[in-house]
Amino acid sequence: MKRALCLLLICLFCTGCSALPPEERAFCVVLLIDGGAQECTVRVRIPTYQQNGGYQTLSASGATLTDALRTLESAAPMRLHWGQLRLIVLSRAWAAEIPIVRTLSDLSGVENLRLHASVAVTEEDTAALAEKLVPENGTRLSKSIDVMVQARHEQGVIPTCAASVLLRFGSRQSPVLCGAESTADGFLLSGAWLTDADGLVRDFLPPEETQILLLMQGELTRTQLLLPEHAIHLTETSTSICLTEDTAVCRVNLRYDRADLTPQAVSAETAQACLDVLNRLQAAGCDALGLGRKAIWSAWSMADWRDSDFPARLQNLRWTVEVRSEPAA
């Protein structure tokens, strides 16, 4: 036994420790999709797995999204794993031509793909934008994206846009996607892209109008609300929407912290901001408030629901907004 141990120690001193085996798989953190009905180009950001860290971009093209992903898998230097996917970025050209539900359905067939990833749309070149996707110092890219998504949603400047949530909407609610852009400091998620009844991108809401949308969705509270003329700090909010055959009423209750504005002034300015956003939604044919979920209960069957032509009814609705404001105690 002692002789065997001595021989083992001699081997270690003479030959040293062997190198660790290289990574057998690469975790895809961001997927970018560009192209249209004739051709699709996909790009992924993966770690370099080098000692100094960093990320690299792999790309591939195909006739369809599925073909492009297969080409990417076969050409990758190691097996790709989708369990750490945090962000799916679609070019505006792609999102305006390919329905979002079709894109997400195709992606849901990818093995181990993380459908809790957020979905965004960009007007910028996806190849250039990919290089902007780098983590904050000392963090992983996946962690940086998680922190940004949470912070920006709490501020109300991006909508809830997880792929798994959007897939559940069906024909009862229109998906709203967040905006993606490059900045001098790197990468930013901001604003909301509206989709129509066919799931195609139609219009963009800037951050301040995205806040109003989230307020009407009941998702905005305890943050600064940027109204057209003033900014107020919300301390409490509640929202309800009532739908009849050809009218809809949005009721908003809010408490705010700003002593120099009267409740009447806050209510009037908030109501007008809501009406402006509702007009944008109607013009885009976007049911971001989920009125379809309410209307479907009046249908006797799915055939009756399809025959009701709810998208046309949505665009002809007459809206009333009632806002009740109270200063915080």
Describe each PLM feature range.
Residues 1-5:
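Bacterial N-terminal signal peptides that target proteins for export
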Residues 7, 11-329:
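Membrane-proximal alpha-helical signals and transmembrane carboxylates
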